[in-house]
Amino acid sequence: RLAAMVDEGGAIMEGTISGVNEPVALIGTAEKGHLSLKLRAEGTPGHSSMPGKDMAIGRLARALTRLDANPQPVRLKALKDLINNLGSAVSFGMQFVFSNIWFFRPIIKMQAEANSTTNAMIRTSTALTMVNGGIKENVLPANAEAIVNFRLLPGDSIAKVCDRVRKIIKDDKVEFEPVAGGAWEASQVSSTDTKSYLILKHTIRKVFDGVV
């Protein structure tokens, strides 16, 4: 069975985690899932000189705005595990905060969301990546399409994300489906209590001076 994989993944972060002064080398213990959804909105076609209220681009824009304003739910387990693995490199104050997540959850959430790296660690991410609608400036298109890309946190699932998307959009005239070849579930989380993990951890510390 494969013990570990070394590729271009991971990073050395500086100043990203509050309460940690040293650079932090990230060792991936899981792989996020992937889901690209194609959204398609239908509307009444026509001429721009006489626009109606049922415009495809407007309907699609409202759906995308709702998805952008309502990110997927927060789960702090991965961030808590990271803090625990950093041990004494984490300030006492931050250790206290993460030992009492039940009380400090709103503060942790606010700080994590302020940084794109830590925000991606606490939730399934939502990215609006492609939009297509209309072929001429004075023509109302009959439909408009967009691609929204999600990176699934381990423990989340394609079915759960699709269900949330449906509830967030709340518009039966906006259909969506996974892009062909663009959907796979997140992996399971590997244990850090293994010989291969410890070897990798000690090797990184020898190669990159001063990292934790």
PLM region descriptions:
Residues 10-30, 34-212:
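Metal-dependent amide/peptide-bond hydrolase catalytic core
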Residues 2-6, 10-11:
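A glycine-rich helix N-cap at a beta->alpha junction
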